[in-house]
């Protein structure tokens, strides 16, 4: 699996992206585990059934991921992984120190980064024949969601107010039989941290690896 994003996305703020990947299961696997993380948040469905949300908030150097047991959600034949990703798209939680606003005692300066919405996902299935893997790559379909207003005010240092237009929702896009042929593919993020974080201070890049995937505790 590789970090992916919508093919035409600029580094905007307050963005929502839909991702889909259809695949075929000949026989139900003995075990199926899906590992997933996103920048900044995700909602996950398998065949229209919601499985979870995440990841946990973290320092960007240690990116948390979630693991879901999805065996009971799979079916013989066509299946789909559907993910809604949300991205702040800009640095958040900046603790700025100025002459008139000194940093409070005991508070450390937090990492501030700009980012593009990204998804990293891998489904691992064990069968009697051989293990099968479905990982995020350029074959995944992606679409910039029009259901949310992106021009909204911040309600604190981290999050924006949410305005959702239900009438704009694409019906059944989380289902396996949805026709996504008109959706574009995804772009693979390459380079520093998958090319997502554009504002990180790289002076400490000698710490290897800079971004470590950590399972949710």
Predicted features, each with a name:
Residues 1-32, 192-217:
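Extracellular/secretory pathway-exposed regions associated with glycan biology
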Residues 8-10, 14, 19-169:
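Accessory beta-strand-rich segments of carbohydrate-active enzymes
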Residues 130-217:
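Activation corresponds to long, low-complexity, non-globular regions
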């Amino acid at each position: 699996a590789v970090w992916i994003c919508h093919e035409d996305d600029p580094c905007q703020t307050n963005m929502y992206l839909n991702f889909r990947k259809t695949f075929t299961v000949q026989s139900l696997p003995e075990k199926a585990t899906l590992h997933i993380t996103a920048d900044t948040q995700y909602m996950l469905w398998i065949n229209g059934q919601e499985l979870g949300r995440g990841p946990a908030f973290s320092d960007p150097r240690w990116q948390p991921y979630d693991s879901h047991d999805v065996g009971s959600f799979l079916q013989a034949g066509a299946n789909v992984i559907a993910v809604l990703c949300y991205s702040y798209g800009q640095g958040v939680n900046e603790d700025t120190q100025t002459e008139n606003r000194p940093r409070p005692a005991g508070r450390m300066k937090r990492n501030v980064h700009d980012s593009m919405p990204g998804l990293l996902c891998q489904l691992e299935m064990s069968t009697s024949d051989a293990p099968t893997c479905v990982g995020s790559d350029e074959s995944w379909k992606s679409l910039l969601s029009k259901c949310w207003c992106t021009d909204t005010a911040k309600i604190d240092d981290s999050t924006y107010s949410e305005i959702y237009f239900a009438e704009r929702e694409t019906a059944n896009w989380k289902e396996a039989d949805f026709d996504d042929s008109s959706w574009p593919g995804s772009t693979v993020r390459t380079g520093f941290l998958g090319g997502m974080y554009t504002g990180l201070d790289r002076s400490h890049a000698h710490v290897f690896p800079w971004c470590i995937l950590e399972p949710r505790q």
